């Protein structure tokens, strides 16, 4: 009878040790996931601040364009600018706007490619980690 008890207690200890190791691995995995989530959140915050900054810059630029155009209209109304000067000013405004929009489009394309790559990597990572026991 004493042999059975000692075998049983050894089996119980081994089972507890295995459970503890499993819990420890699960905890380490969760700690890693929390760290990754915090890093991801920081990146999202940085991107949000960048977008807000770009929006503010864009709105300021649009206000500048509006005032430049309204200044041209005022000069035309008061006959203070010739048609050729008005055309030149208007073409400069259009050229600057197109350059700015092209740069913004290029940046957004680059960001979209980066985001797509990150999404694919994250999907692959979480698909592989969820299939692990």
Curated annotation (Swiss-Prot):
Key words, A-Z: Cytoplasm, Cytoskeleton, Meiosis, Sporulation
The keyword Cytoplasm is annotated on this UniProt entry: yes
Induction cue: Induced during meiosis by the transcription factor mei4. Protein levels rapidly increase during meiosis and then decline.
GO CC terms of this entry: cytoplasm; meiotic spindle pole body
Subcellular location: Cytoplasm, Cytoskeleton, Microtubule organizing center, Spindle pole body
Main location: cytoplasm
GO biological process, alphabetically ordered: ascospore formation; ascospore-type prospore-specific spindle pole body remodeling
Protein family membership: Belongs to the VPS13 family.
Purpose of the protein: Involved in sporulation. Plays a significant role in modification of the spindle pole body prior to spore formation and is required for initiating forespore membrane formation. Assists in the localization of spo13 to the outer surface of the SPB.
Subunit description: Interacts with spo13 and spo15.
Further facts: The sequence is 100 percent identical to the C-terminus of vps13b.
Protein name: Sporulation-specific protein 2
Gene: spo2
